[in-house]
């Protein structure tokens, strides 16, 4: 099976078009105002209209309250909710039940011990995403161009699909897939020319490299 690819932090039609044309499986929209990739619900609603039905539209949230989720989900047609904050298993389950959408819980890791944090989420999330721990003092929980030791994931199984993120680029994604065994990868800053500005050539190169990176 080819590696699945998620292009996250899309803010304009050009990036959306390229991601779709090159066969991205997931496109991510960020609903977190401190991020340079943040989009308003109305803007996001416009962007998802460019994505065909077989492309999974993902909304990234950081410790969202119900009001935030209500505002976005009444305007934007999303298929998957990505929770990238400190949401507890109880909160993940509550969001999943309230909104009737699958949830991908992000876990920030730097070493093998951090993987133990996945256990409480296995019964309440639909998918996991392993991202690098943000640098100390960082405002953003992800999209920081920081990676981690991919070998800590080698041979690991959780009973849920999982995705790899954290400092991935066209130059290293094939190796990351080979070492970690990831069946899906997520990129944001690694396909940008500046924070929040996606680079079409980098998107193309990333997807091509990711798809060639798994035996």
UniProtKB/Swiss-Prot annotation:
Pathway noted in the entry: Amino-acid biosynthesis; L-tryptophan biosynthesis; L-tryptophan from chorismate: step 3/5
Any one GO molecular-function label of the UniProt entry: phosphoribosylanthranilate isomerase activity
Single Gene Ontology BP annotation: L-tryptophan biosynthetic process
EC primary class: isomerase
Entry EC no(s): 5.3.1.24
Keyword tRNA-binding attached: no
PANTHER family in alphabetical order: N-(5'-PHOSPHORIBOSYL)ANTHRANILATE ISOMERASE (PTHR42894:SF1)
Record protein name field: N-(5'-phosphoribosyl)anthranilate isomerase
Source organism of this protein record: Paramagnetospirillum magneticum (strain ATCC 700264 / AMB-1)
Gene name of the record: trpF
């Amino acid at each position: 099976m080819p590696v699945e690819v998620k292009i996250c932090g899309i803010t304009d039609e050009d990036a959306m078009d390229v991601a779709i044309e090159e066969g991205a499986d997931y496109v991510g929209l960020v609903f977190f105002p401190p991020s340079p990739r943040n989009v308003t619900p109305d803007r996001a609603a416009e962007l998802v209209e460019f994505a065909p039905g077989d492309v999974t539209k993902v909304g990234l949230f950081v410790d969202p309250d119900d009001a935030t989720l209500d505002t976005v989900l009444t305007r934007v047609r999303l298929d998957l909710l990505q929770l990238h904050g400190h949401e507890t298993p109880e909160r993940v389950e509550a969001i999943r039940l309230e909104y009737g959408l699958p949830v991908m819980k992000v876990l920030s890791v730097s070493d093998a011990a951090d993987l133990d944090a996945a256990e409480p989420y296995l019964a309440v999330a639909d998918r996991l995403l392993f991202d690098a721990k943000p640098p100390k003092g960082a405002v953003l929980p992800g999209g920081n161009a920081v990676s981690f030791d991919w070998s800590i994931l080698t041979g690991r199984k959780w009973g849920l699909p999982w995705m790899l993120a954290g400092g991935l680029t066209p130059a290293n994604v094939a190796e990351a897939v080979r070492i970690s065994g990831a069946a899906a990868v997520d990129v944001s800053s690694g396909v940008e020319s500046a924070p929040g500005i996606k680079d079409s050539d980098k998107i193309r190169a990333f997807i091509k490299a990711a798809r060639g990176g798994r035996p």
